[in-house]
Amino acid sequence: NLDKWQFPSIELPPQSLITICASGLDKVRIPARWESLVRADNVWKYWNASSIPANYASWKDLGYNDQNWSSGAGGIGYGDNDDQTTIAPTPSILLRHEFVVYDVEEITHLIFHADYDDGFIAYLNGQEIMRSDNLSVSPAYHELTSSQHEAAMYSGGIPDDVIFDEEEVEELLLDGANILAIRVHNASTNSSDLTGNFFLSAGLTSAQSQYQNIPAWFSPPVVLPHASFKLATGETIIISDTNEVISDSIAIPEGLTPNLSRGRTPDGMGNWCFFNTPTPNGTNNQSNC
């Protein structure tokens, strides 16, 4: 069946490479570019009063009325000199930032980054997407964390992150308005600092700029396409064009053991041979045949 699986619709420059995972997961869309939907330095709504806000049960949901909340550019906190908006010392703070997604179909992946002191829980359209490990399942408004956690970015570090694939993106994002809501908690009532710097970035199929630039420290993750099939000894891999003209093929050999690979050398034109050093995402020309 020469139509079993098609390569993703991307343009490869000359002499470039692409790695396909034979996982059976059938994920062909990979990002053409990354942009930020939400950045820490955007303007956020925040609540740090001594008592809970009105309609507290729905504070993290889209459509919640936060008109009487304070506003400020992030990060929002105190101490460490990593805050654009400095607040009075507090056990906790609630943050909200509404943003627009033009077309969810153009987003293949999401990455959420969290730089925090001391604990947090993040929600996207009311669904929890990431949390620190030092808070209870449903923390009270002024609950303290069970341990300390120091922010990373102010000393040159990289924030923690979690990545979401295409199926998860479809469950989390909406066309139009979306809300990122985050609660940040301190470890003690007399803590010298509180930090909340959060970023939500998207992998886009479109090469056209639509949102915000990614932060300078952002390193795009390696996202590989996954074929709809797996491989087993004796099966044959065939590459053909859309007219079913075969370009190349190979049967999976018996002798293909861990730490060996099989391919042509030089790349794409020489004889088939076993390589004693597999080179995924790299040329075969550096391997010993």
Question: Which role does the model predict for each range below?
Answer:
Residues 115-118:
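Short proline/glycine-enriched turn/loop motifs at strand-loop junctions of beta-rich domains
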Residues 1-109, 121, 129-289:
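Intrinsically disordered, low-complexity linkers and terminal tails enriched in Ser/Thr/Pro/Gly
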